[in-house]
């Protein structure tokens, strides 16, 4: 089902107007996806946020969590959480406060931060610390995502609107893989553990420091501390 914010039919993606040497500029238009899978590219990601997010209401909580830029990305968190909840329709909707707590624990709301994430993962980039390995999966038409790909490159991930759109999509995927590993429906907290590569420790009854930090932020956003 096509989301009302999308600019093109399913199986196509939006390409913004761009100049062409020696000719008139090409206006924004829909282009077919080779695989037929639903994909969203940077131009449409930006356009969706620009057209739709400013009038939305609701979470996340306006708590900076001690960070100077702690509330700067609330509109993007709110918008992309709503978008992916409506597209992917989980039994338990994703909470925007959980996304904000995840961003706080991953990057401290620093949109251009870059960290080494290991030999296979490569670099982790931006607000939600999306790795090079994850970025390749999100864009791979023949890969593990059955549908709803986010086609952004490594440079795009320094843009908060793209990073949050891609990071939330990946969190939904991690909920699926956590469910498979657990043999039951994973909670969103367990999806975060899988996102952070801590699910094995959590399953063993351990409390990794990264999860304690994330949970403390989430509790504060829910006004429980």
Describe each model-derived feature in a short phrase.
Residues 86-94, 182:
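Short, charged helix-capping/linker segments at alpha-helix termini
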Residues 115-141:
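Short, surface-exposed glycine/acidic/tryptophan-bearing loops
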Residues 80-85:
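A short alpha-helix/helix-coil micro-patch that ends at or immediately precedes a cysteine
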Residues 112-117, 205-206:
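Short, solvent-exposed loop/turn and secondary-structure capping segments
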Residues 32-79, 136-225:
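Non-catalytic cell-wall polysaccharide-engagement segments
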Residues 91-113, 130, 167, 193-196:
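Short, functionally critical alpha-helical segments immediately adjacent to catalytic or ligand/cofactor-binding
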Residues 72, 94-98, 123-125:
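Extracytoplasmic
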Residues 1-40:
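Arg/Lys-rich, low-complexity, intrinsically disordered basic segments
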